[in-house]
Amino acid sequence: MDSTTAIGNGVGSGGSPGFCLKDPLNWGVAAEAMKGSHLEEVKGMVEEFRKPVVRLGGETLTISQVAAIAVRGSEVAVELSESAREGVKASSDWVMESMNKGTDSYGVTTGFGATSHRRTKEGGALQKELIRFLNAGIFGNGTESCHTLPQSATRAAMLVRINTLLQGYSGIRFEILEAISKFLNNNITPCLPLRGTITASGDLVPLSYIAGLLTGRHNSKAVGPTGEILHPKEAFRLAGVEGGFFELQPKEGLALVNGTAVGSGLASMVLFEANILAVLSEVLSAIFAEVMQGKPEFTDHLTHKLKHHPGQIEAAAIMEHILDGSSYVKAAQKLHEMDPLQKPKQDRYALRTSPQWLGPLIEVIRSSTKSIEREINSVNDNPLINVSRNKALHGGNFQGTPIGVSMDNTRLAVASIGKLMFAQFSELVNDFYNNGLPSNLSGGRNPSLDYGFKGAEIAMAAYCSELQFLANPVTNHVQSAEQHNQDVNSLGLISSRKTAEAVDILKLMSSTYLVALCQAVDLRHFEENLRNTVKSTVSQVAKRVLTMGVNGELHPSRFCEKDLLRVVDREYIFAYIDDPCSATYPLMQKLRQVLVEHALKNGESEKNLSTSIFQKIRAFEEEIKTLLPKEVESTRAAIENGNSAIPNRIKECRSYPLYKFVREELGTELLTGEKVRSPGEEFDKVFTALCKGEMIDPLMDCLKEWNGAPLPIC
């Protein structure tokens, strides 16, 4: 930023985030942050998440850095900018000097909130009382339920609070911030209550427990590096914080508790995952189009360019990239050309309008990400110490509305992604809609003893229902608090918590859906090989039985072969393959129908036994019944042993890295009723990998060749 256009706190580079006079309302900065593609932004987040150090200066913290500190623990170190020390010290000194001069300042010489009319000269005692009365949380120790904030969310809050206080507007000593960073770097996490904050005036109650640990309160506890419970003295020793517990100076207790760090810290974690899940939903939609034999024109750039929404345009371009050159798309095109007037002209909405559905949701998630990144780099306590103007400013930056609103919006977007996923899943397992895949995606030999993903569909309905409930807003449930002083409040942390729940449920859905898509990929592989076997067998039998008459002469039935093979091409394999020669299944019925139709056209020749096609039907069917079941079983066994005649098409597709990860690295396999392994066991593997971030690389590998633009309109 041009230093000539910034107003600082008058105390060095660490004392001010800078205020650009060329963009006084900050809209320019906000717009600049939205440039480029969402995918490139997510790639940048992942890269930053994996860095070994997070350097804090108060101005450049990102959600990926917060997520890294939250979940990677001691793998990532926190470093405080030394240049911020001067500004932090200046604001702390100003508070002490103003106290000594008798200046009346909120929370320094006054009571708090609705009782700020009270006055005291005992500034240190006032801070101690602030922490005591805010320690109002319930942990439920000794009960089955847990009411403790997850350690990851607490670590996120600690990092964000340090970042805010580093900017030098809060009147707190640098040494306290160093102590918090030592707790982070040594993986020592204070125990904070899960509930009890309305995120205005900040997250008072949970943050007071961080202050409680710093001051050595008897009821304060922390969790150590190996999960052990620590009392304050032991926590200080393990963290290497010297000098004993802190005796808070005037304003320092208020500086620690009067901020939005818990809500915005958790929101950062949530959004890091939501952004990745949004990209995953785009790729899963493309794989859905592949296994459903969808028509790829739904991704055509002109369609989306005419709609103007950037999220939609990018979603379509990503799907277009996955489908471009896909072996499934090429094969499906041939199928669509066969009897086109007997098939739907368009795919259903869950496939065809997936870019239009996902696009606005990605825009919402991206916008929320920027809003939360502004919040975690904001100074959000009260009062603010403006050293350069020699005054304390009484305002309301503790109001966490950006968090509540962003999280409500994100949760709605997450729920809508889940709704699309459920609609796609429902089509995938339904043999009325899935273009020839078996009902329930059953992969076994006997569908009467294999119900595939039926239980999974019920679970998906449960997930989706809960997710839709969570989509309801939190921010319209505000209650007037603290003697009507906090009469409007953001409910930021509550909304963040509910969004974290929603993201967790979307991960359950994504895991289940991805395993189902891999099942569908394998079933298409079975389908292709089995159809090839059936065609080969029918062709072989036709040549053997229908070509020659009893005396070696050419027989009229030899002309039936082409139509017989056309039946095999047109009939869904899984409609008959469990018992291919059954008279009640369509294959034998339609093969016979071909022979009957040819016989009816045979005219006078049909009256002659030596040229009658009717006379060939029994021999043809008997030969089919002799050969086909053996050939089908042989083909099944070959596929199961990895020796299929036709390789799996997925290996030729850009979606292959995701399939390969699920099948090879996670060790999942085709689910059938013949095997002991349950669907939930496979879903668990994928869910765990998704939670650990192990799916990020294969997901990004699917898109590594994308140049950030749609294909040209030709």
Swiss-Prot record:
GO cellular component annotations of the record: cytoplasm
Location(s), subcellular: Cytoplasm
UniProt modified residues of type 2,3-didehydroalanine (Ser): S201
PROSITE patterns the record matches: PAL_HISTIDASE
Pathway membership: Phenylpropanoid metabolism; trans-cinnamate biosynthesis; trans-cinnamate from L-phenylalanine: step 1/1
Keyword Protease attached: no
Record: active site: Y106
Highest taxon of the lineage: Eukaryota
Residues in cross-link 5-imidazolinone (Ala-Gly): A200-G202
Residues where (E)-cinnamate binds: N258, Q346, R352, N382, K454, E482, N485
Annotated keywords: Cytoplasm, Lyase, Phenylalanine catabolism, Phenylpropanoid metabolism
EC nos: 4.3.1.24
Gene Ontology BP annotations: cinnamic acid biosynthetic process; L-phenylalanine catabolic process
Record bears the keyword Lyase: yes
Pfam families from the UniProt entry: Lyase_aromatic
Alphabetical list of CDD domains matching this protein: PAL-HAL
One function term, GO molecular function aspect: phenylalanine ammonia-lyase activity
PTM summary: Contains an active site 4-methylidene-imidazol-5-one (MIO), which is formed autocatalytically by cyclization and dehydration of residues Ala-Ser-Gly.
Primary location: cytoplasm
Catalysed reaction, written as an equation: L-phenylalanine = (E)-cinnamate + NH4(+)
Subunit-level organization: Homotetramer.
Family, as annotated: Belongs to the PAL/histidase family.
Biological function: This is a key enzyme of plant metabolism catalyzing the first reaction in the biosynthesis from L-phenylalanine of a wide variety of natural products based on the phenylpropane skeleton.
Name of the molecule in the record: Phenylalanine ammonia-lyase
Gene that encodes the chain: PAL
